[in-house]
């Protein structure tokens, strides 16, 4: 019978969050050695060694995916996993949960404001989670950091999830939320009606689709912040095959999402409602794009950024060469991830404020 590695035993006894914070304080070389000792089987020389350790531990625990067929269980598991790594939240002057009475139905949202007495621009944020998991709580720390360091209000939207809801229904709610914020800009103290859309992964997909749908409307998004968004269910690019295993997002995950979100709702894989890379790219607002090198979505996002430039859209594309999909969620336990999130927040605001 094989013995449990001491680190695995420590993580099991102390909990994932405590164990991850302990790993975060180890030197990079020690993290590399630990990942090797835990038999991490993949060769990704430039990947953050802290992430390698986390992935090695996940594999040792028999977890190769963060979602699975049992959607109800996947939701509970994801919430528990995110709760386990949460630390003390970044302080903010105002954080409140509010109800949005939309045309498509009432939903919850979380409003973050770093200076409630001031008028500030707003970012509408749509959380990631493969369209089927995730919540206001799972992305709370990211939204706090974004509000503080971009000096903006953030409205995080609790949109309905698949498979219970179709892409059309989900997108409609997300677009209605943007329209609601615009209609209530005076009450919300939104500076000069400046409202951007943002999201990570599946949320980045929704932000992209909403931005496309809002072009020419009174509530059109003024900017986009897209963090490793899902943009193309139809095509497979080199990064898909290079990084399809042993990381946060796997080929297995993408195939499951494709089936539950797209195919089960009788959508074509290249329908712009689910694959916005095939949508109308004219007159889109300035777009700040984030990719992680070790992400199977890397190439499709890079291609989209290139397409936007070809259509005259002002684009800034930042690639984090040592990161993988989902790294913004590691900010509570990773000094490097937190540094990157703060950098993204500050640089996005500078980009947004810059004149053409």
Language model: regions and residue ranges:
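A glycine/proline-hinged amphipathic helix-loop "lid/cap" segment
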Residues: 1-111, 353-356
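Alpha/beta-hydrolase superfamily serine-hydrolase fold, recognizing
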Residues: 6-24, 42, 94-356
């Amino acid at each position: 019978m094989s013995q449990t590695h001491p680190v695995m035993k420590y993580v099991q006894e102390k909990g994932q969050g405590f164990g991850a914070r302990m790993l975060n304080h180890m030197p990079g070389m020690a993290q590399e050695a630990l990942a090797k000792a835990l038999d991490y089987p993949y060769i990704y020389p430039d990947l953050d060694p802290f992430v390698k350790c986390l992935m090695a531990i996940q594999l040792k625990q028999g977890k190769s995916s963060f979602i699975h067929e049992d959607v109800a269980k996947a939701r509970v598991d994801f919430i528990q996993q995110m709760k386990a790594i949460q630390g003390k939240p970044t302080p903010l002057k105002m954080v409140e949960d509010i109800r949005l009475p939309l045309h498509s139905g009432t939903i919850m949202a979380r409003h973050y404001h770093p200076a409630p007495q001031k008028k500030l621009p707003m970012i509408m944020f749509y959380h990631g989670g493969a369209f089927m998991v995730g919540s206001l709580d799972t992305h709370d720390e990211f939204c706090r950091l974004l509000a503080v360091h971009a000096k903006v209000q953030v409205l995080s939207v609790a949109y309905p999830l698949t498979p219970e809801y179709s892409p059309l229904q989900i997108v409609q709610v997300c677009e209605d939320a943007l329209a609601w914020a615009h209609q209530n800009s005076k009450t919300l103290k939104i500076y000069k009606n400046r409202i951007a859309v943002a999201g990570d992964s599946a949320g980045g997909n929704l932000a992209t689709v909403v931005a496309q749908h809002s072009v020419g409307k009174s509530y059109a998004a003024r900017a986009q912040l897209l963090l490793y968004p899902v943009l193309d269910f139809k095509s497979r690019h080199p990064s898909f095959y290079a990084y399809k295993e042993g990381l946060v997002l796997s080929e297995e995950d993408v195939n499951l999402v494709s089936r539950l979100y797209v195919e089960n709702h009788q959508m074509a894989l290249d329908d712009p409602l689910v694959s916005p890379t095939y949508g109308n790219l004219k007159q889109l607002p300035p777009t700040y794009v984030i990719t992680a090198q070790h992400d199977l979505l890397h190439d499709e996002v890079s291609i989209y950024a290139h397409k936007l430039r070809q259509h005259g859209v002002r684009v800034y594309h930042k690639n984090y060469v040592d990161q993988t999909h989902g790294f913004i969620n590691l900010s509570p336990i990773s000094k490097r991830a937190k540094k990157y999130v703060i950098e993204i927040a500050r640089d996005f605001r500078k980009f947004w404020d810059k004149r053409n």
